[in-house]
Amino acid sequence: MNLKEKTRALFAEIFGYPATHTIQAPGRVNLIGEHTDYNDGFVLPCAIDYQTVISCAPRDDRTVRVIAADYDNQVDEFSLDAPIVTHDSQQWSNYVRGVVKHLQQRNNAFGGVDMVISGNVPQGAGLSSSASLEVAVGTVFQQLYHLPLDGAQIALNGQEAENQFVGCNCGIMDQLISALGKKDHALLIDCRTLGAKAVSMPKGVAVVIINSNFKRTLVGSEYNTRREQCETGARFFQQPALRDVSLEAFNAVASELDPVVAKRVRHVLSENARTVEAASALEKGDLQRMGQLMAESHASMRDDFEITVPQIDTLVDIVKATIGDRGGVRMTGGGFGGCVVALIPEDLVPAVRQAVAQQYEAKTGIKETFYVCKPSQGAGQC
């Protein structure tokens, strides 16, 4: 049974009437452009064929009822007429409540909803299961009540909910690609203007995601430290964001900066340039150049931004040794564990899978999880 069938069946069973709509919003993987989003820079993600699915129907009152199929059918119920506050014990509820609360501040021309939620975006892997949930919930209200909100506004609403209600700092990329993703394409997103340009993916290329299964521990505190270091760098150049600083300007005065801040700034500036070039390489079907850019990105994250761990570096080395110059591989996501992403010809997938299976656990003591994905469509009815 797929997620649509599962949520529709559960909806009818629990609520006693059929759902009127089923909405999906995908997870994502970022091909290149890491820690550039909160510096107003560029990112190049694609939506993947793992998603959050919600079967839903409008109610004729002001109550929102939610069933989480993946959490033993836990229930949350709240009123649109009372202040929406955080749930004490169900963390998943806060993503739903946060989205609805912030939606009310944007456009409160909506009533109650019944919904059943299920998803298959791996959690804790850096593939944006939370953004996928936020965008799916926002799209439910937009579709059921014909709210005049576009994908970018639904994405911004999800980001606000995560930053302000759930209390987790994040850039806009995850929600934006979940809302705006395009089948068989990546999106070059300008995180300042939220402009997105569809970049076609070469035919016969697989998007492979390998989870290191190294438990991320430092990610919150270190993420915030990196943000502060980037802000310090922008202040040094008297610019609103590092987006506005050129590599030439940086190189001229790099020695005057705190050495650690200088390394962080150099990563962001070089990564921005790599990301724009990567979009053009992908469009031309130049997988060799894309692979070089991904390798440079990984080295920069490892040496300048210092967000990789030995397990991730090992995984990258195993994949790189297998694919040579026929594709690319790098860490993807916030860092300190999580996943690597590889762009490789489909005929190389079995060899990569085998090499990783034979070597990664032997070298690290951890078993990886291997996903082969397709660039997929953003949020909407399914």
Swiss-Prot record:
The keyword Metal-binding applies. It comes from the Bacteria. ATP binds at G124, A125, G126, L127, S128, S129, S130. InterPro entries: Galactokinase, Galactokinase_bac, Galactokinase_CS, GalKase_N, GHMP_kinase_C_dom, GHMP_kinase_C_sf, GHMP_kinase_N_dom, GHMP_knse_ATP-bd_CS. Its EC number is 2.7.1.6. It is found in: Cytoplasm. GO terms for biological process: galactose metabolic process. Substrate binds at E34, H35, T36, D37, Y223. Pathway: Carbohydrate metabolism; galactose metabolism. GO terms for cellular component: cytosol. Gene3D superfamilies: 3.30.230.10, GHMP kinase, C-terminal domain. Keywords: ATP-binding, Carbohydrate metabolism, Cytoplasm, Galactose metabolism, Kinase, Magnesium, Metal-binding, Nucleotide-binding, Transferase. Belongs to the GHMP kinase family. GalK subfamily. This is Galactokinase.
